[in-house]
Amino acid sequence: MSVETALPIEFSDAAAAKVKTLVSEEENPDLKLRVYVTGGGCSGFQYGFTFDEKVNEGDMTIEKDSVTLVVDPMSLQYLVGGVVDYVDGLEGSRFLVQNPNATTTCGCGASFSV
């Protein structure tokens, strides 16, 4: 009997598929998607996404479909229960965070407050 442990943040199938495509295009299998939170934006905090080859001490990693999502401990506290997703819509294609901790979110979804 196995017990599944819920991860503090989820990585959607769409986000994992897009990361896999981008990593393949760069021909660098060591690249990982790093999501982070910084001060700024119209709501106080903003999400950031970058590709990174390294994992720092204390970082959380989530693997899905052979790709890795990395979150630093400071950002993780604002992202617990969230979902990193990738959307392709009228506002363009982008990674985003569906964050249950956000009390307000700006119109584009790039910044939030808690």
UniProtKB/Swiss-Prot annotation:
The keyword Metal-binding applies. Iron-sulfur cluster binds at residues 42, 106, 108. One of its GO terms (cellular component) is cytosol. SUPFAM superfamilies: HesB-like domain. One of its GO terms (molecular function) is 2 iron, 2 sulfur cluster binding. Binds 1 iron-sulfur cluster per subunit. GO terms for biological process: iron-sulfur cluster assembly. Keywords: Iron, Iron-sulfur, Metal-binding. Its cofactor is iron-sulfur cluster. The keyword Cell division does not apply. Belongs to the HesB/IscA family. Required for insertion of 4Fe-4S clusters for at least IspG. HAMAP family: Fe_S_insert_ErpA. Homodimer. PANTHER family: IRON-SULFUR CLUSTER ASSEMBLY 2 HOMOLOG, MITOCHONDRIAL. This is Iron-sulfur cluster insertion protein ErpA. The gene is erpA.
